Amino acid sequence: MPRILIIAPNWIGDTLLAQPLLARIHQRLPGVTLDALAPAWTASVVARMPEISRVIETDFAHGPLRLADRWRLGRNLRTEHYDQSVVLPNTFKSALIPFFADIPLRVGFVGESRYGLLNVMHKLDENKLPLMADRYAQLAEKPGDPVAPRLAVPHLAVNEANMLITMARLGLDRSKPVAVFCPGAEYGPAKRWPAHHLADFAKRLAARGVTVWLLGSNKDREVGDDIAAQSGNAAINLCGRTDLAAAIDLMSVARWVVSNDSGLMHVAAALGRPLVALYGSSSPEHTPPLAHTDKLVRITRIDGLECSPCYQRECPLGHFRCLNELSPERVLLELDALPPALAA
């Protein structure tokens, strides 16, 4: 049976948007083994994908080339005898390891002029394929062939035992309905709903008898503390207190998720959680959360602003209207319009 190495994207959201590609490969090649090469910060997500047999975790950070290290890893991977590699990032360096591993078929987009490193080249027509999920899915087809109808949306396995252990460690319970807030956004502050809005929203939910958990990385710990304090501890700050795998498992019990445009937003959709997705400087046109049904996601933003989306890390005009004017009342209406959660 064929063995294929997937070079996974470097962002959590992009990684989940690549899952329909994996389903398509399995459809085209029954019995295929898919392994994935993934950075440490996304490996936990890839490991929860049923299409993936094995995750090879790397420590390559954004930026440095580390050519010698990539050469050594590629040489070591020669013993795996992969038949093909599919390279999802467009960077030059992401195509080096399959080349050094001497994998016969190396598939990907031209990207950063990767002639020679790749030998099955796709040219990307961004206007024809505006959605990132469809762009990735194109790599399962022959160059120039149309993308097949989407087979599946992202889906992540949940580790029930790990969830219970994490809840016990953190002193959490599910005696009340749980809402999860994801206050972070790796890209920058222009994608983050203000802390005072989140705190106000947490108090409104607490008044309804809802338990509010804040999930995020250690980078979000400070803003989580701020939200918890402003909410009178209506929100429990778990940012930085779990790894990504535990965050996935905790999120799986949420009755609702409210998230900025971030990796955890895509995790919520993959878990079938009813989701209010908040957009400010970014747009859902290219990388929307993919859910089992559109009714599970409420895309929420301020319409009619000429300056939005600006795709900037910080508001270039200083007023931050796109998220400042997104009121807790509006978000509560969106949350109330959501259907019940699906089984995770």
Regions found by a protein language model. Give the residues of each.
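Catalytic machinery of carbohydrate-active enzymes
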Residues: M1-A344
